[in-house]
């Protein structure tokens, strides 16, 4: 169930936090709020009361563990229920998140929730260039700027008309109309060079970007070289339906999605265990793939 509230306001962020801990950690109390948001116990209690007033069937106080626990008919109202939402929150808290209301003498203490994540190398983007790109998008302007690529390593001037920043896993890029190539294309942010200069209103609207505005579906299946038992594992991993995973995506982003899933569209890896997923509608989506 998708949330009916999102943590976009001060109140909603507290309600979201209450529900997040209650659902995923099985308990929440005023001390959790007080420590996480650096507020008084009185304020924290008011937020707990507010949550219970809004969603009276969700939480019940348990004297034994000194906290509110989910009731059997708990209904998600502020969180999505997707484990990645909780894991993303954990990631933002640091390498260890403890049960903040636990004490070493309490019989219901829990072990700290430990986790870690990879630290990816940063790609340098000049603040001057970044501010110019933001300004060009906000004001719908053309931008004169230098750019290098592996095929043209010498700094070449470009006039672009940017419309969207895109994160594709390891890096950020910019979707923009390129006047040199006369097409909408992707530019890696760290490869812009020089002193950018705004040069008048953009002449191409994002609505003209066919690759950006075309929705396609990638159909994936477990590698057929896997055994039936192995295929079932992959199907469960990705919550496949009838042995297939269908992923709707903007056509311009299809290749990036496949790369993140480590799905090769050129050749199969040496074994099914290494490949795991295969794209079964390659001919259908081939016009949008740039490594086919």
Task: Tell what function each PLM region has.
Residues 1-80, 220, 272-292:
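Short, basic/aromatic recognition patches that contact phosphate-bearing ligands
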Residues 16-20, 85-89, 252-263:
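Short, hydrophobic/amphipathic alpha-helical patches that form generic packing surfaces
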Residues 54, 195, 260-264:
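Conserved short hydrophobic interaction patches
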Residues 65-67, 142, 171, 244:
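A generic structural signal for beta-strand entry/edge sites
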Residues 70-144, 260, 267-270:
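Bulky hydrophobic/aromatic content
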Residues 110-224, 229:
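Core beta-strand-centered patch of the WYL/Sm-like small regulatory domain
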Residues 213-292:
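Polybasic (Lys/Arg-rich)
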């Amino acid at each position: 169930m998708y949330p009916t509230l999102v943590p976009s306001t001060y109140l909603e962020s507290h309600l979201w936090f209450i529900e997040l801990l209650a659902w995923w950690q099985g308990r929440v109390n005023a001390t959790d709020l007080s420590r996480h948001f650096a507020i008084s116990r009185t304020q924290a209690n008011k937020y707990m009361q507010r949550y219970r007033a809004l969603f009276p069937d969700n939480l019940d106080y348990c004297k034994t563990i000194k906290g509110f626990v989910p009731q059997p008919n708990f209904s998600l109202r502020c969180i999505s229920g997707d484990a990645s939402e909780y894991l993303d929150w954990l990631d933002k808290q640091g390498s260890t998140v403890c049960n903040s209301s636990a004490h070493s003498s309490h019989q219901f203490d829990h072990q700290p929730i430990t986790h870690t994540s990879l630290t990816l190398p940063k790609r340098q983007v000049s603040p001057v260039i970044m501010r110019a790109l933001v300004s060009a998008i906000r004001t719908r302007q053309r931008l004169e700027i230098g750019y290098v690529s592996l095929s043209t390593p010498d700094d070449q001037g470009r006039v672009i008309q940017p419309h969207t920043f895109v994160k594709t896993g390891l890096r950020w890029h910019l979707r923009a109309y390129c006047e040199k190539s006369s097409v909408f294309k992707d530019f890696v942010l760290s490869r812009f060079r020089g002193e950018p200069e705004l040069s008048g209103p953009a002449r191409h609207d994002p609505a003209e970007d066919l690759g950006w505005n075309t929705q396609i579906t990638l159909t994936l299946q477990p590698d057929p070289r896997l055994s039936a038992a192995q295929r079932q594992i992959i199907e469960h991993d990705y919550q496949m339906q009838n042995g297939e995973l269908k992923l709707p995506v903007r056509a311009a982003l299809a290749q990036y999605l496949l790369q993140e899933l480590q799905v090769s569209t050129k050749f199969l890896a040496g074994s099914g265990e290494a490949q795991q997923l295969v794209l079964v509608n390659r001919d259908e989506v081939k016009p949008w793939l740039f490594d086919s």
